[in-house]
Design a protein with these regions (language model features):
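Outer-membrane beta-barrel initiation region
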Residues: 24-95
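Transmembrane beta-strands of outer-membrane beta-barrel pores
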Residues: 41-47, 89, 100-106, 134-140, ...
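Outer-envelope beta-barrel architecture signal
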Residues: 29-37, 79, 92-94, 126-130, ...
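Residues on the lipid-exposed face of transmembrane beta-strands in outer-membrane beta-barrel proteins
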Residues: 37, 83-87, 118-122, 164-170, ...
């Protein structure tokens, strides 16, 4: 089964927090400690039959009357903290850091914006800048134990993701950027399709499991048009290697990001298109 999606996002960030928007921020020449904390408020909307809540923000209805029912639209407003503390070894152009990343913050991608990274950056002459980090999402994300439960109150369960991120910026002194992200997704209680009203066999229930691994590869080119405008086209490939064959999918994505510098502010607009194909047909539909 093939699925396509088009999404757009607009974010506005303060100038003091957006000086570094590359996959790997510039490493200072001087040794020592550095860091910053930026506070913001994010607002948006969510339509999902899988997500229950993000932190204290409810994102879905705990009861549905039909499997064909469209997901309700939920508006959300939540604080966003973008921070980093780092220690730099100036002589070797090495930096150790803990925090979340400015590039994710400006992409306005809720999933990656909330990730916290513990990592190391290394600048290598004529090669580029490389970043390796361990990533986790400290804010609890709850999903429905059985999202296919009809005319009953659906219970929620916590979903966690941990993984590794590797970035290579200014590849061979060009303006190309490469990223690979590998994650493991776990649920405390996975009960998809277990309702007796569905009449699914155990084998069919296993096809609906949402746990497993996700690999995402992205290649960008940072085109500096002039002092105020930058255009960043990109191509990506995502492989959802989930335990349920009906939930596993893979496919390619196209991205186009425009950055407009307004002095102390920077306006970021992002357009994405993704086309993915599932391994198996969902046994319910």
């Amino acid at each position: 089964m093939s699925k396509s999606g088009l999404s757009a996002a607009i974010a506005l960030g303060l100038g003091f927090c957006v000086s570094a928007v590359h996959a790997v921020p510039t490493i200072p020449e001087a040794s020592g400690w550095s860091g910053h904390v930026n506070l913001a408020v994010g607002a948006g909307g969510s339509e999902s039959n899988m997500l229950a809540s993000l932190g204290s923000v409810d994102l879905g209805d705990d009861r549905i009357s039909s499997l064909d029912e469209d997901a309700g639209s939920e508006d959300l407003v939540m604080p966003i903290v973008q921070f980093e503390v780092a220690y730099t070894l100036g002589d070797s152009a090495t930096q150790f850091y803990l925090g979340n990343q400015v590039a994710d913050y400006l992409n306005f991608d809720l999933e990656t914006t909330l990730e916290t990274h513990l990592g190391i950056r290394q600048a290598i002459p004529d090669i580029g800048a490389v970043d390796f980090s361990l990533a986790t999402t400290p804010l609890a994300t709850d999903v429905w134990k059985d999202p296919y439960l009809v005319d009953q109150r659906r219970g929620d369960t916590e979903r966690t993701s941990t993984g590794v991120k590797i970035s290579w910026d200014d590849i061979l002194s060009t303006r190309f950027e490469f990223e690979w992200v590998g994650k493991e997704i776990e649920l405390d209680d996975e009960e998809s399709g277990t309702s007796s009203s569905l009449g699914l066999s155990r084998a069919q229930q296993r096809q609906l499991r949402r746990t497993g691994d996700v690999d995402r590869f992205t290649l960008h080119y940072d085109w500096q048009i002039n002092e105020r405008h930058r255009l960043v086209p990109g191509i990506g490939y995502t492989d959802y290697q989930l335990d349920g064959d009906a939930m596993a999918e893979d496919g390619f994505a196209l991205h186009l990001k425009h950055l407009y510098d307004l002095g102390r502010w920077r306006l970021v607009t992002k357009l994405s298109y993704e086309d993915v194909e599932s391994d198996e047909i969902n046994p319910i539909y």
